[in-house]
Amino acid sequence: MIEGYIHSIESMGLVDGPGIRTVVFFQGCRLRCRYCHNPDTWTMRSGKEQIFTPEQLVNKLLRFKPYFGDNGGVTFSGGEPLLQKDFLCEVLRLCKHAGIHTCIDTAGCGCGGYEEILAHTDLVLLDIKHFSLDGYHSITGQSPQEFLQFLSAV
């Protein structure tokens, strides 16, 4: 059974993609960005996370669908949603089947398998940390290799 670790869910997101959106903040991120807004999402298992199956999460999201109107939907953010690729992919697939617009707000630092994820994604908000290798490492503490792999998949 696939499970996902979710930090929190915001039901009235107005700045995380077009329209009125529900924002799902995933738990877990490998980066340690100097300016991170959500450092409490860094660890995958914080002890405070909510655990969902894909079906449970989508059933929760369906309750908000009437508020999305013609141009809203759901945005998956974090943390880094791409780190939970199997869970994310199944949630995206179920959302698309339910007619929910999908968006991923990501730094592009996951575990590969991006083509399948992107096949069920309507919009990607890609956080480009820096344009140089040294600058990227200085800000995130990591190499940009995984980011570049995701960028080529997009």
Describe each PLM feature range.
Residues 58, 62-66, 70-73, 78, ...:
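Conserved AdoMet/S-adenosylmethionine-binding subsite of the radical SAM
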Residues 1-18, 59-62:
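Auxiliary Fe-S-binding modules of radical SAM enzymes
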